[in-house]
C-alpha cells in the first residue's frame, strides 16, 4: 500500500513537470509588427520595402483566451530606396478602428505558445464580405468611403518620387494577418506574422502616382515578425514614438 501511494505521488509530480503556467497578461501593451516585402515602385524598380506598424493593445484575459483591442499609433515605411518616400498621415492611422481580436495561450513543455486568430481589415471601403469581395477600383463605387474624413475617396497616402514628383494617392486596402509566437515573460511576447495585403489606387493628384504598387512578401519567414511589450497605460502615441528605439533595442 505504501509503495502504491509513493508511486501515485511520483506520477502526480512527473505529470506536472514541464507544464508552463499560464501568466496573467491583462493590461496595456505595445504591438510592433514588421511587414517586409519585395516591391516594384515607380521609377525605382524592384526594391526591398518594409512597413513597421506600431499600436497599443488593451488585453483582457479569461483563462487561456485573450481579447485584444487595438489602438493604432503610426506606421513607418522604409521604401528601400532614397528615390521614393511614402508617408502615412496621422489622419490615416486615427481613422482605423479595428474590431476586437482574440488570441489563445497554450502551455507546452517549451513554454507558453501565443496564437492570435487570422484578422481581416478593409480600409477605405465597406464590403459585404470583407474576406472575399473584390476591392473597388472606381472612386465612385458606392462601397468606397472617405474613411479619414479629408473629402477624398478611400484613404489618403502621401508619396514623393525623386524629390520632384509628389502628391496624394487615394487608396483602398485589405490586410490580413495572423500572429503566432511565444510568451517570453509576463511583459513580453515575440513571434512571426503570416500576412497578405491588397491595395488599389483609386485616384491621385499626380498621374504618375496612379499606378498600383506591385509587391510580394519577403521570402524569409523570419523577417516577418512581431513584438509585444507591456507598457504604462498612461503612455500616448507620442510617448511611444519617443521611446520606440528603446523598446526595439536588442530585438
Task: Enumerate the language-model features and the residues they cover.
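Positively charged n-region of N-terminal signal peptides that target proteins for export
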Residues: 1-4
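Bacterial N-terminal signal peptides
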Residues: 7-15
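N-terminal helix-cap/turn-to-beta initiation motif at the start of protein domains
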Residues: 17-30, 183-185
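Short, hydrophobic/proline-enriched secondary-structure or compact coil segments at domain edges
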Residues: 26-38, 61-78, 188-193
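Outer-membrane beta-barrel proteins
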Residues: 38-40, 202
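Surface-exposed strand-loop-strand hairpins of Gram-negative outer-membrane beta-barrel proteins
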Residues: 41-51
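Predominantly extracellular/secreted and cell-surface proteins with exposed
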Residues: 52-184
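Edge beta-strand at a domain terminus
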Residues: 163-190, 195-251
Amino acid at each position: 500500500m505504501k509503495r502504491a501511494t509513493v508511486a501515485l505521488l511520483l506520477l502526480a509530480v512527473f505529470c506536472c513537470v514541464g507544464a508552463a503556467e499560464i501568466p496573467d497578461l491583462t493590461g496595456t501593451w505595445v504591438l510592433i509588427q514588421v511587414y517586409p516585402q519585395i516591391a516594384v515602385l515607380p521609377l525605382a524598380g524592384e526594391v526591398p520595402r518594409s512597413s513597421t506598424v506600431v499600436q497599443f493593445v488593451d488585453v483582457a484575459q479569461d483563462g487561456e483566451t485573450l481579447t485584444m483591442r487595438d489602438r493604432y499609433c503610426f506606421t513607418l515605411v522604409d521604401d528601400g530606396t532614397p528615390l521614393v518616400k511614402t508617408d502615412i498621415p496621422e489622419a490615416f492611422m486615427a481613422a482605423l478602428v479595428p474590431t476586437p481580436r482574440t488570441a489563445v495561450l497554450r502551455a507546452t513543455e517549451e513554454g507558453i505558445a501565443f496564437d492570435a486568430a487570422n484578422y481581416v481589415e478593409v480600409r477605405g471601403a465597406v464590403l459585404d464580405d470583407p474576406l472575399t469581395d473584390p476591392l473597388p477600383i472606381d472612386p465612385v463605387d458606392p462601397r468606397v468611403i472617405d474613411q479619414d474624413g479629408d473629402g477624398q475617396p478611400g484613404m489618403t497616402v502621401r508619396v514623393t518620387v525623386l524629390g520632384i514628383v509628389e502628391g496624394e494617392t487615394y487608396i483602398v486596402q485589405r490586410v490580413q494577418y495572423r500572429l503566432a509566437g511565444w510568451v517570453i515573460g509576463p511583459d513580453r511576447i515575440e513571434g512571426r506574422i503570416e500576412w497578405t495585403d491588397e491595395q488599389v489606387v483609386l485616384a491621385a493628384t499626380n498621374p504618375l502616382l496612379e499606378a498600383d504598387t506591385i509587391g510580394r512578401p519577403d521570402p524569409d519567414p523570419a523577417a516577418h515578425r512581431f513584438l509585444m511589450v507591456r507598457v504604462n497605460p498612461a503612455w500616448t502615441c507620442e510617448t511611444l514614438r519617443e521611446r520606440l528605439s528603446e523598446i526595439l533595442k536588442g530585438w
